[in-house]
Amino acid sequence: MPDLLLELFSEEIPARMQAKAADDLRRMVTDKLVAEGLVYEGAKAFATPRRLALTVHGIPARQPDLKTERRGPKMGAPDAAVQGFLKATGLKSLDEAKIQRDPKGDFYIALIEKPGRDAIDVLAEILPVIIRTFPWPKSMRWGARSGKPGSLNWVRPLHAITATFGLETEEPDVVKFAVDGIEAGQTTYGHRFLAPAAINVRRFEDYEAKLLDAKVVLDPERRKDAILTDAKQLAFAQGFDLVEDQNLLDEVAGLVEWPVVLMGSFEEEFLATPAEVIRATIRNNQKCFVVSDAKTGKLANKFILVANIEATDGGKTIIAGNERVIRARLSDAKFFYETDLKTKLEDRLPKFEQIVFHEELGTQAARITRIERLAAEIAPLVGADVAKTARAAHLAKADLLTEVVGEFPEVQGLMGKYYALAQGEDASVAAACEEHYKPQGPADRVPTDPVSVAVALADKLDTLVGFWAIDEKPTGSKDPYALRRAALGVIRLIAENTLRLSLMKVAASALAGLSVKPADVQKLPGDLLTFFADRLKVQLREQGARHDLVDAVFALGGQDDLLMIVRRVDALGKFLESDDGKNLLAGTKRASNILSIEEKKDKRTFDGAPDAALYSLGEEKALAKAISEVQAEASASVAKEDFAAAMSAMAKLRPPVDAFFDKVRVNDDDPKVRENRLKLLNEIRSATRAVADFSKIQD
């Protein structure tokens, strides 16, 4: 079947827009094809700085013919309705219509046959629409046509459109259409400087190969691989290791069509500036990679740049230009750093009085005071020194007002650590200045120093409680204050440091420090706990655990010790994987279902202890005895936080429960016996609630 080749050739597309633009082009074209009945076999899109390209293969040469029925008016309807029906369906007279028998009357039915069109004609119709409605985040108009109504908007001036369609074994046809005076053809262009001449192309394989000959690597993944491989080899040859940076690699691959890797250097005196600042300076300003000494691992005074040209002088001029700019930028960074060192962190804090954190939650200064108080309260719970924790919380945000962080926000916290160490603060205090922001994502490291943990928890819990208090909660996909990330951070801090904390108590303490109070003060900690439960389900699901087990544990009530919840969920999951667990779950659910039906029927519950005198069968007596023993054993194990032992105790219920359902008829003819047996079923449900609410567990 025929293939489509489409290229949109323009001035340089911003690197950050290229990946989404390629995906949008693929999606828009293929969606339209499918909507037109042209189901394709495969599609792939590409982007370089100067072009978007798409290949769609296995497109049918022609649309299928369509046959549809359209229902018209009833027989005997007014002439106006009949004439409207004939006009709408293209029928010459009612003789061409069918009659459909219906209980409501007999109706005219038009059989409409719509012959399929050639795929190339469909493409000529849909491609201009796609180009004109392309969803660029920012676009422009240009040239003489820009002032005319309906002129094309594109991210950068669009120069040429290549569009061919045909079988692999035949000469393809040009898809004939024009957009804003730009006619589609078979001509593209190579590298702007190395091979700018026009190139005639036929289909994708021919197109990609000719572009490569014209110094254009079409596939961004190939460009990334080439940059990474060449950069590593160049660094290795000089005795260095490349400091890899995936985000920078993605960006640089969008800046070049023909990547050429070169190495430059800067003066060693700049290495006195923190390595992270040097890296941020070189990355942000010149889009260059840094390297480290292969022996010591320390940052070296070299950098790797990626040019878009094979220079006749071997790249000397390009290197010199980059060195000149980097030298100036590093000089600025060094000045910022040295200026910052002249002012102590605590001396910066008064300025926070003029900085509003949130209009309802007060200034940054007020927030720092809250975090300091809360961190000091949390410190004994996590084994941290109270004085060091309070000091760390006091200084943790101070680096936000430094020159370096103002220039490079990504090093906030890290610079706080460097400045704290420079002014002689304790190592734990300095570490907390950096680590209190962590973890900032699922792959981010979790702090282990108790002081860092205490300040990190206080920072995140103050944020969560504060925004809960003013009813600024996440909704759907909107989470402007990153509260979901903060909650996951709290969960990871607790779980990975095996901390015992009552979230309800800590949340209440955080709430007490707020000047603003919610309408229902008592409700807030519980609402926040529900939010943590939802986040914990997300966390455990990503780790392969079942989210319904989290519901089963939280349903017990009073569960706000996340570490114990995680351990209980783990033990419950292992138990339910065993035959005893599966069968006990089935028995418990059967008991719950029977109880639900009978409670609804009788409009009452069957609470209270069964009457042993009414037991007439051995299976009843055996089950009652087993429940009594298991309840005592499981409760004792839970009290000792030995959840595995509690599950083992639960397993002892399986045989008597199975026997009871095999031999005993619950709904006995004697009302008293029936009631007693239903109470015994309720005892099964109550016994299992020592570890979880089994009714919340999915089969």
Curated annotation (Swiss-Prot):
<keyword id="KW-0436">Ligase</keyword>
<dbReference type="GO" id="GO:0006420">
    <property type="term" value="P:arginyl-tRNA aminoacylation"/>
</dbReference>
<dbReference type="GO" id="GO:0004820">
    <property type="term" value="F:glycine-tRNA ligase activity"/>
</dbReference>
<dbReference type="Pfam" id="PF05746">
    <property type="entry name" value="DALR_1"/>
</dbReference>
<keyword id="KW-0963">Cytoplasm</keyword>
<dbReference type="GO" id="GO:0006426">
    <property type="term" value="P:glycyl-tRNA aminoacylation"/>
</dbReference>
<keyword id="KW-0648">Protein biosynthesis</keyword>
<keyword id="KW-0030">Aminoacyl-tRNA synthetase</keyword>
<dbReference type="Pfam" id="PF02092">
    <property type="entry name" value="tRNA_synt_2f"/>
</dbReference>
<dbReference type="InterPro" id="IPR015944">
    <property type="entry name" value="Gly-tRNA-synth_bsu"/>
</dbReference>
<dbReference type="GO" id="GO:0005829">
    <property type="term" value="C:cytosol"/>
</dbReference>
<comment type="subunit">
    <text>Tetramer of two alpha and two beta subunits.</text>
</comment>
<dbReference type="InterPro" id="IPR006194">
    <property type="entry name" value="Gly-tRNA-synth_heterodimer"/>
</dbReference>
<keyword id="KW-0547">Nucleotide-binding</keyword>
<dbReference type="GO" id="GO:0004814">
    <property type="term" value="F:arginine-tRNA ligase activity"/>
</dbReference>
<dbReference type="InterPro" id="IPR008909">
    <property type="entry name" value="DALR_anticod-bd"/>
</dbReference>
<keyword id="KW-0067">ATP-binding</keyword>
<comment type="similarity">
    <text>Belongs to the class-II aminoacyl-tRNA synthetase family.</text>
</comment>
<protein>
    <recommendedName>
        <fullName>Glycine--tRNA ligase beta subunit</fullName>
        <ecNumber>6.1.1.14</ecNumber>
    </recommendedName>
</protein>
<dbReference type="GO" id="GO:0005524">
    <property type="term" value="F:ATP binding"/>
</dbReference>
